[in-house]
């Protein structure tokens, strides 16, 4: 893997004053260039903002947070491409067939994004993506030393025939 795709629950934990010390410690030792966000994380902030009543004092705070994340991760903000959507369709269908339950849409789209970009999916929602095929890291519980990140230039993709 070449880096980390942060789920919204991880970004919220990192920036929260009362966030998990373990999650913050993990994030603090990562090379910033290896951390990525999906546009879906920004959309989840938009959803949270839209869900607040008019005049809610948290609205400007959440808007500033969203805008700061978008700016900070601008070069590492991953879109939902056609390839990712098609991979998500395959993941969702397979998980539903194998488990009998439809998987959460956003979580499995994040898993498809992580797979497409050769990233670990960093989330607390391990149960929601465990059948996706993505490599999942839970910073609340997992030992990060077991998750190697290789420099991009050393990474090799198998040749396609």
Language-model features: locations:
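Alpha-helix capping/helix-boundary segments
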Residues: 10, 41, 84, 110, ...
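Acidic, PIN/NYN-like endoribonuclease modules and their adjacent C-terminal/linker elements
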Residues: 111, 115-161
């Amino acid at each position: 893997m070449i880096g980390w795709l942060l789920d919204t629950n991880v970004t919220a934990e990192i920036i929260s004053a009362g966030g998990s010390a373990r999650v913050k410690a993990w994030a603090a030792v990562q090379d910033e260039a290896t951390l990525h966000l999906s546009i879906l994380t920004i959309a989840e902030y938009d959803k949270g903002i839209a869900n607040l009543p008019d005049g809610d004092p948290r609205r400007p705070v959440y808007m500033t947070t969203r805008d700061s994340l978008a700016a900070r991760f601008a070069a590492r903000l991953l879109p939902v491409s056609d390839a990712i959507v098609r991979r998500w369709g395959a993941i969702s269908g397979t998980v539903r067939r194998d488990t009998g339950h439809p998987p959460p849409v956003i979580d499995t789209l994040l898993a498809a994004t992580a797979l497409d970009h050769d990233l670990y999916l960093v989330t607390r929602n391990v149960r929601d993506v465990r059948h996706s095929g993505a490599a999942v890291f839970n910073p609340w519980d997992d030992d990060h030393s077991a998750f190697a990140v290789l420099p991009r230039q050393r990474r090799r993709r198998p040749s396609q025939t």
